[in-house]
């Protein structure tokens, strides 16, 4: 999938059909109800479950109050513009609780851990691990064989469309709770220490830390050993 630019994302959101899907558990004299074709029904006898848009389901419930003994509604979004990514055929390990929106690219053998939030237009390279509760903003790009530590935020940019996204090159290790501001590029093989706030580009093969992040040293054998990417964790 080719990465979307900001104008394409804006157009996608603008022109998408906004959705408020609901799931409703029903019981009552349901055989007397005529369900619209846009409502999916899974009903046996006097109980069942239906799926549909709230704009269709709400008047249906109101019109059939006499035939419905009770119901419970589940709803998790309102006028949502971007569906979640269909993950069934992605060649990666994606753990429960990750929230990944449509139009995201995920490379082979990538790992997305619990609680990660990945916005539209983001790109994750082959073999990269996105740890727990990481936020990848719109159009954020992470290269191959990286590790983005738990709780880190890679700022997204959809508006203004002229802004540049965060770019993380290959073989980068970012510690926990790091914030990378929009437009920053982190060079290949760099290491960003936990808790850093990265406000400017990071040179390849360097180690940075602090608020704001500053270069501490060139990557040496000791640091490389401590930040080694383990391919065993990426096997499917």
From Swiss-Prot:
PROSITE patterns: HEXAPEP_TRANSFERASES (PS00101)
One annotated GO biological process: diaminopimelate biosynthetic process
PANTHER family per record: 2,3,4,5-TETRAHYDROPYRIDINE-2,6-DICARBOXYLATE N-ACETYLTRANSFERASE, ACETYLTRANSFERASE
Molecular-function annotations in GO: tetrahydrodipicolinate N-acetyltransferase activity
Keyword field: Acyltransferase, Amino-acid biosynthesis, Diaminopimelate biosynthesis, Lysine biosynthesis, Repeat, Transferase
Tree of life domain: Bacteria
InterPro entries according to UniProt: DapH, DapH_N, Hexapep, Hexapep_transf_CS, Trans_hexapeptide_repeat, Trimer_LpxA-like_sf
Protein name listed in UniProt: 2,3,4,5-tetrahydropyridine-2,6-dicarboxylate N-acetyltransferase
One family name in Pfam for this protein: Hexapep_2
Alphabetized Gene3D superfamilies for the sequence: Hexapeptide repeat proteins, Malonyl-CoA ACP transacylase, ACP-binding
Catalytic reactions of this protein: (S)-2,3,4,5-tetrahydrodipicolinate + acetyl-CoA + H2O = L-2-acetamido-6-oxoheptanedioate + CoA
Enzyme class, first EC level, given as a word: transferase
Lineage of the organism: Bacteria, Bacillati, Bacillota, Bacilli, Bacillales
Pathway per the UniProt entry: Amino-acid biosynthesis; L-lysine biosynthesis via DAP pathway; LL-2,6-diaminopimelate from (S)-tetrahydrodipicolinate (acetylase route): step 1/3
Coiled-coil zones: none
Family the UniProt entry places it in: Belongs to the transferase hexapeptide repeat family. DapH subfamily.
Its EC number(s): 2.3.1.89
Protein purpose: Catalyzes the transfer of an acetyl group from acetyl-CoA to tetrahydrodipicolinate.
């Amino acid at each position: 999938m080719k990465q979307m630019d900001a104008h394409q994302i804006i157009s996608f959101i603008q022109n998408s059909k906004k959705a408020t899907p609901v799931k409703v558990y029903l019981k009552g004299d349901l055989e007397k109800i005529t369900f619209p074709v846009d409502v999916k029904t899974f009903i046996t006898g006097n109980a069942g479950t239906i799926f549909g848009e709230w704009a269709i389901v709400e008047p249906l419930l109101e019109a059939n109050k006499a035939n419905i003994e009770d119901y419970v509604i589940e709803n998790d979004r309102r006028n949502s513009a971007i569906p979640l990514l269909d993950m069934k055929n992605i060649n990666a390990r994606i753990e429960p609780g990750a929230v990944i929106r449509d139009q995201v690219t995920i490379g082979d053998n990538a790992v997305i851990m619990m609680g990660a939030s990945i916005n539209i237009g983001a790109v994750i390279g082959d073999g990269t691990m996105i740890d727990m509760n990481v936020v990848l903003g719109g159009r954020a790009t992470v290269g191959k064989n990286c590790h983005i530590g738990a709780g880190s935020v890679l700022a997204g940019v959809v508006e203004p469309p002229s802004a540049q996204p965060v770019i993380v090159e290959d073989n980068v290790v970012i510690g926990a709770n790091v914030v990378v501001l929009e437009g920053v590029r982190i060079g290949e093989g760099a290491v960003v220490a936990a808790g850093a706030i990265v406000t400017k580009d990071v040179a390849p093969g360097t180690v940075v830390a602090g608020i704001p992040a500053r270069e501490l040293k060139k990557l040496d054998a000791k640091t490389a050993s401590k930040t080694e990417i383990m391919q065993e964790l990426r096997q499917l």
